UniProtKB/Swiss-Prot annotation:
Native organism: Shewanella baltica (strain OS195)
One Pfam family cited in the UniProt record for this chain: DUF188
Membership in a protein family: Belongs to the UPF0178 family.
Record protein name field: UPF0178 protein Sbal195_1808
Length: 150
């Protein structure tokens, strides 16, 4: 059995990204674990598992952090979760294909906190752009770069 594994912070993960991950898990015979506080539809596969955690703030995040190992990849748009993953020596990739690294995570956390403070003071900051075909392609390309090592 491979030491490599992909974890997905699945509650907010776009469906097109899940589909890419399902195909990759099958193609590479690689364990894929989707963690969510609700049931997620997954195809029948010996490589794909779903973990349903209890409701509550960051319960899925805590589960992933507890189980992740340095050879694992975590798919998440949650920047604080990505920071914890990096601290454990694993890799974190967001659904738009951006790899979180030791070099960029502090800047990402700072910007996230700044935007949260602005919203807290009543400033309308807007949200991220809609998930696009370009985002899907960027994710697939980044995932493929990681899969080459597996």
């Amino acid at each position: 059995m491979s030491d490599y594994k992909i974890w997905v912070d699945a509650d907010a993960c776009p469906n097109p990204i899940k589909e890419i991950l399902f195909r990759a898990a099958e193609r590479k015979a690689l364990p894929l674990v989707l963690v969510a506080n609700q049931m997620i539809r997954v195809p029948p596969s010996p490589y794909i598992n779903q973990i349903r955690v209890g409701a509550g703030f960051d319960v899925a995040d805590q589960y992933i952090v507890y189980h992740v190992e340095p050879t694992h990849l975590v798919i998440t748009a949650d920047i604080p979760l990505a920071a914890l993953i990096i601290e454990k020596g694993a890799l974190a990739l967001n659904p738009r294909g951006e790899l979180y690294t030791v070099d960029n995570i502090k800047q990402k956390l700072t910007m996230r906190d700044f935007m949260e403070d602005l919203r807290g003071s009543g400033v309308h900051t807007g949200g991220p752009d809609s998930f696009s075909q370009a985002d899907k392609q960027a994710f697939a390309n980044s995932l493929d770069k990681w899969l080459v090592r597996v």
